[in-house]
Amino acid sequence: MAADISGIHEHMEVVGSDGQHVGTVDRIDGSTIKLTKSDRASGGRHHMIPTDWVQSADGTVRLNKPAQEAMSEWKAAE
């Protein structure tokens, strides 16, 4: 069952299932979350992650995979 993503908003912290920081929400674009490029984890680029990875969104967006795995699989935005 997919998580309710309606509570996700700009500047929410995104963490992995291990509680480690992944990024900060810039915006949601359909079924994709765009992370800010100014975040310390971003390397100065926007990255995109699918909303399918969201486990919960209650003040913090928690993913269903550890931070390192999410960061190795995210897509850099053009």
Residues covered by each model-derived region:
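Peripheral interaction segments used for macromolecular assembly
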Residues: 1-78
